Amino acid sequence: GQIISREKAHAEGIPHRTAHIWIIREKEGRVQILLQKRSQNKDSFPGKFDTSSAGHIQAGDEPLESALRELKEELGISAVPEQLHFAGTFPISFAKEFHGKMFRDEEIAFVYIFNEPVNTDELILQTEEVESVQWFDLEEVCEKCEKHRDIFCVPTGGLEVVRKYLDKVKTA
């Protein structure tokens, strides 16, 4: 493949790979996911709740390397490879205008699950990327994210990968 900038990939809709990390926990018998509220300065979906952590896979990197890097950069979580569980991939494809510019996204997202204790008060948020974080009930987000695009920009394909992974783990 060729090396292109993030800006060019989204200006021209060039296919690329991303790493998505979903932080989960069980509370009172229900699965919760940690969502990040995107910074108001983001070039897409500013101020919306999104995947726990995500980012482009850099040239020469493997998806797992990028996932570990994004967790550290965005949330200050120093994870080791054994703590990230590969759950699958899904495509993202859309074009939408933000801040007066077209944003075209054509990506394959590699999904990882992080199911370790997380104290949100101790996270070190990358303020250019992340405004805040909040725990949500997984099923509630699945129900609401399509109807409430004013609040959530969570990719539904990612939620499906997470749910399938959890179903598989439950029956294993």
What is the role of each PLM region?
Residues 13-14, 33, 133:
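A residue-level structural signature of the nucleotidyltransferase/glycosyltransferase Rossmann-like core
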Residues 1-28:
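Acidic, metal-coordinating catalytic segment for phosphate/diphosphate chemistry
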Residues 7, 47-49, 53, 88-172:
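Nudix hydrolase/Nudix homology domain
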Residues 1-3, 29-37, 121-125:
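Short, well-ordered strand-loop elements centered on a beta-strand within folded domains, enriched
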Residues 18-56:
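A glycine-rich, hydrophobic loop/mini-helix early in the fold
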Residues 41, 73, 143:
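Active-site micro-motifs of SAM-dependent methyltransferase domains
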Residues 35, 52-89:
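The catalytic Nudix box helix
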